Amino acid sequence: MRRSGEDVFGGAGLSGIEVQYVEELFDGANRVGVGGHEFLPATADAAGVASLEGVPHQLLLADAETAKDVLTFLGRATRISDEGVRLQAARGVLALTGAALAPHGLFDQTPTVLAMRVVQVDPELECDVVVSSLTATDDDSALTLPETGLSPAWAGVAPPRGHWQPTSTLAASVIARRAQWGISAVARGATPGSGEEAVRALRAAIWGEPDEDLGGLPRGVAFAADAFGFISGEEDVPVMQSGRWTRLAFRRGHVLARGPVAAGLTAVRGTGSAQ
């Protein structure tokens, strides 16, 4: 049985078929099925809410620790935004994706930065839904889905299925330091009485800015790694690229950022600038 903390996107503890499935996950949301039978929830309303009536309402996970892992990821995601977590499952693998940062509206310059973690699930479960909550049950290894799902815009922006090319590595300590710098900058800039739009613009400016210490990636990748608990001790984090997307493969999960194609990413030194 795979431990829930292992690196699965890179292949640790998974068969070749499972790895291939994980890299083909990003294709369509709001589908749920069991045993090969697919169910389609109702179309989302104007508020982005989709009914899950008539679909299986339980996730059967590998064990109690995996269920706790899923709830922890969801809890971290809900502290960041109210746009839920995407659950994509098939072939015994469940990928959880949350948006650390995502634009709201045409002129919002916030980058799309996603966090992903993968765990084992009931091999017969097939699903692709976005939910804002999951509920523990009498079975420690099972979680109950809510009655309704969500349809956030970020869930329709799919990372590529494959062709990830290694470009560099980043020291986890540097990523952590840049995250703390950004958090402090947001706190300093958000004056009392700042409106929602002003705070959003401030966050977009700070987290969306390319950071030299992160190889030119938006500083938001550091925020995502910190907020979702992916940084743990010393680690050289592989950086991979596919088209407009960049992926940071931590041992605890993955951060994916969408933006202009970055050329010439190089390994970053172990010390960061104070800025």
Where in this protein do the model-derived segments appear?
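Actinobacteria-biased recognition of intrinsically disordered, low-complexity terminal regions
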Residues: M1-L60, E65-K68, L256-Q275
